Design a protein with these regions (language model features):
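Basic, Lys/Arg- and aromatic-enriched nucleic-acid-binding interface segment
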Residues: 1-26, 30
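Feature representing long, continuous alpha-helical segments
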Residues: 20, 27, 31, 66, ...
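Conserved tyrosine-mediated DNA breakage-rejoining catalytic core shared by Y-recombinases
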Residues: 32-75
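Short, polar N-cap/turn motifs at the start of nucleic acid-interacting alpha helices
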Residues: 36-43, 130, 146-168, 191
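Catalytic-site neighborhood detector that most strongly recognizes the C-terminal catalytic loop/helix
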Residues: 55, 155-184
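Major-groove DNA-contacting interfaces characterized by cationic-aromatic clusters
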Residues: 64, 70-120, 204-206
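Short, basic (Lys/Arg/His-rich) helix/loop patches that form interaction surfaces
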Residues: 85, 100-152, 156-160
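C-terminal secondary-structure termini that scaffold catalytic or DNA-interacting sites
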Residues: 110, 173-209
């Protein structure tokens, strides 16, 4: 997250980190704009949208609401969701190709399994070589799970048990606190103009809980 990258990868880094923070499918991510940003009454910013994949299977058309951690808010304010790199997802110079270059530059080289259908063998390859936008959602869920956030809490996945129902109904404030803990991000509050408020405001709020 804090690694320095060359200028030609800075936009890719911002887009990749923001997509990781939002647990967002690439099709939905490409359509986000500042109109998707909202703020709770107690000052927690979040992104809300109707996921294209799940809206066809849910009768109540529930929006997905994901709180913005501080680093994600900074990217949103800096970019306004306008990423030229998202113009093309595939291709030699597309988003997925640049994600591979970004991960290679940052030395994300942990070995992972990759099945070779031609030879029916399992190969071990560096993670950066198979990086893509799909890795964003996996990264979000893996990190969130480390803070005991069930994967169903972070998106509108099919509900299959009472435990899943509990997690999928987490309030934005609770999910915000859990994600901040998982991603090692500070808790904060903002005003309606997306300005971060002094930390004393948060301290007083927590005292009054």
């Amino acid at each position: 997250m804090v690694a320095d990258v060359p200028d030609n990868l800075k936009e890719t880094k911002d887009a990749f980190l923001l997509q990781c923070a939002l647990d967002c499918r690439i099709g939905d991510f490409m359509k986000l704009s500042m109109s998707n940003v909202a703020v709770t009454d107690d000052g927690i910013p979040y992104v809300q949208y109707l996921p294209k994949k799940t809206m066809k299977t849910q009768n109540d058309r529930r929006e997905k609401k994901t709180p913005l951690m501080l680093f994600a808010l900074e990217i949103v304010k800096r970019s306004g969701f306008k990423f030229g790199v998202l113009r093309y997802a595939s291709g030699k110079s597309g988003y997925n190709a640049k994600i591979k270059k970004l991960l290679e530059h940052c030395k994300i080289d942990r070995l992972v399994n990759l099945y070779d259908e031609a030879t029916s063998t399992m190969n071990r390859v560096p993670l950066h070589s198979v990086g893509s936008s799909k890795l964003c959602r996996k990264t979000h869920i893996d990190i969130a799970n480390k803070a005991q956030v069930n994967m169903y809490a972070t998106g509108l996945h099919e509900v299959g048990s009472s435990a899943v129902e509990h997690y999928s109904m987490l309030e934005i404030r609770d999910l915000f606190m859990l994600l901040c803990a998982a991603f090692n991000q500070p808790r904060y509050r903002i005003d309606k103009q997306l300005n971060v408020l002094p930390s004393e405001n948060l301290a007083m709020e927590e005292i009054n809980l």
